[in-house]
Structure formats: C-alpha cells, structure tokens
C-alpha cells in the first residue's frame, strides 16, 4: 500500500496516537519546539505549515519525543534499577545498546537474575511515574533473551 494509505489506516486504528501527533505538530507551530517529560527540548525553528495542513519535519516531530524518551531517559533509569537489583550478585550489567541492557549472567545465578528481571518488569511503570510524573496508557514491558552470544539467544521474557 502507499504511504498515504498506510498512514490513514494507522490513524484510524491508533486514534490516541494520531491525536498526540496532532498535538505535537500544534506545539511545534506555536512554540517552535517540543518538550518531553524529562525536560529535554527539541527545536524546530524552521517548521512551516503546508497548504495541505501538514507541517515540515513531521516525521521528526513524531519520532524524536518517543525515541529520545525511550533511549535517553527510560533505558538509563531502568538500567540503574536493574544494576541495583543485581548489586549483591556476581552477575552484572555490562553494557547498553540502544534500548537493550546487556547483562553478564553468572551460570549459577540464571534463575535468580530472571526473577529479578521479572521484578523489574513489574516495577517499570511505577519507576517511570515516580521519576517523570506520567502515567502510561500503553503497554511498556521488558523483553529478555539469553544466550552465550547475540547470535544464539532465546526469548525468556
């Protein structure tokens, strides 16, 4: 299907997200910027409205708040929480890549780490709410894979 058809179906299926996109576009046209819950701002000083009603940079206007909030705010917050949960174990957080947290799991602690990740999953929304004072009305869950390397992983959460 064409891009226009795809977007039309998207906005019909996800009306709340479409309304939020419209709100972001209005914010950019009124203020020239978007402010996300963490306080980070994205400036769009050259944004203009086309005769069709759409605005320039609309893809960035829709994408920056989501990608930024996820990778620059939520992931580090949860990374610190998971690191704290693992603090008494031999297993440890060794890296983060985009929206992934990499944990080196000691062989004897696999079940314990899995339990702690389930716990972190249960705490996720309340941690975000406490830090940023927002309530998510969309699912936000951790996913976990385990393996000896990135190529040989299996889903565990």
Predicted regions: what they are:
Residues 1-157:
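Conserved catalytic core of nucleotide polymerization and phosphodiester-bond processing enzymes
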């Amino acid at each position: 299907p064409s891009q226009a058809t795809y977007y039309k179906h998207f906005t019909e299926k996800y009306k709340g997200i479409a309304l939020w996109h419209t709100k972001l576009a209005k914010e950019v046209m009124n203020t020239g910027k978007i402010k996300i819950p963490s306080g980070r701002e994205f400036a769009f000083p050259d944004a203009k409205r086309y005769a069709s009603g759409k605005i320039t940079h609309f893809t960035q206007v829709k994408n920056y708040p989501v990608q930024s909030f996820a990778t620059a705010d939520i992931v580090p917050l949860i990374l610190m929480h998971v690191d704290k949960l693992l603090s008494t174990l031999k297993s440890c957080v060794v890296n983060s890549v985009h929206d992934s947290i990499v944990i080196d799991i000691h062989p004897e602690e696999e079940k314990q780490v899995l339990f702690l990740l389930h716990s972190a999953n249960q705490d996720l929304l309340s941690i975000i709410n406490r830090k940023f004072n927002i309530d998510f009305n969309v699912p936000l869950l951790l996913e976990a894979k385990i393996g000896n390397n990135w190529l040989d992983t299996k889903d565990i959460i």
